[in-house]
């Protein structure tokens, strides 16, 4: 084991090569030879990765988006279907499990193993359940300003107070309603429970 950065550890693992662990306060990134990279939040939930020239990002609703350049050089963003999502997530978990077995076999006992154990709690089934739980905490978040993607969204109201723009259909499926104080406090409690330790990744608060 070699420390190669302030929070980065390098470990050589047979059959894999050099594996880098970036241990941040609220996230963990694992990189296999800088070719297969995947990262997780402080609770151990898979957040996304980069492999085979494709970037993946998992949303709080457990949808998985992939981004890549097509043969003409155009950037493509698309949500994968359930079969592909399951294959990717299970492959990541299998890789992490294999790394854990190698570390245990060589007598490693460290923060790296503690984080890996947290990651391995979140298999595909549990992440799917988390996606369902998301919709018990939030009404659909139709759109966010680009500078608020990493904010903690709190829904003090539902719908749009105007909702008459002919070019916008984001909130036509629901009436505008402001939550009363007790409702909003309960919403905040559910949000905090949902994010857990990973709430530290959120840079600001955005009220909807």
Regions found by a protein language model. Give the residues of each.
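Long terminal accessory regions outside catalytic cores
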Residues: 1-102
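Residue-identity detector for threonine
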Residues: 28-29, 166, 190
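N-terminal [4Fe-4S]-dependent radical SAM core
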Residues: 31, 36-58, 87, 91-154, ...
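Generic, low-specificity signal for short hydrophobic/alpha-helical stretches with a mild N-terminal bias
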Residues: 71-74, 78-81, 134-138, 142, ...
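Canonical Radical SAM [4Fe-4S] cluster-binding loop centered on the CxxxCxxC motif
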Residues: 145-186
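Core AdoMet radical
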Residues: 171-187, 191-208
């Amino acid at each position: 084991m070699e420390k190669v950065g302030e929070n980065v550890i390098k470990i050589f693992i047979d059959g894999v090569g050099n594996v880098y662990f970036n241990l941040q306060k609220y996230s963990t990134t694992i990189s296999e030879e800088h070719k297969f990279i995947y990262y997780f939040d402080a609770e151990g939930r898979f957040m996304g990765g980069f492999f085979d020239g494709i970037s993946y990002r998992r949303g709080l609703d457990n949808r998985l988006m992939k981004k890549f350049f097509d043969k003409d050089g155009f950037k493509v963003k698309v949500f994968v279907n359930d079969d592909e999502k399951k294959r990717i997530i299970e492959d990541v978990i299998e890789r992490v499990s294999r790394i854990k077995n190698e570390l245990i076999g060589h007598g490693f006992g460290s923060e790296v193993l503690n984080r890996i154990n947290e990651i391995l709690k979140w298999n595909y089934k549990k992440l799917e359940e988390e996606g369902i739980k998301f919709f018990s905490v939030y009404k659909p978040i139709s759109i966010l300003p680009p500078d608020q993607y990493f904010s903690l969204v709190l829904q003090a109201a539902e719908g749009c107070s105007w909702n008459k723009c002919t070019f916008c259909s984001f909130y036509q499926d629901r009436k505008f309603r402001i939550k009363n104080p007790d409702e909003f406090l309960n919403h905040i409690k559910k949000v905090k429970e949902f994010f857990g330790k990973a709430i530290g990744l959120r840079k600001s608060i955005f009220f909807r």
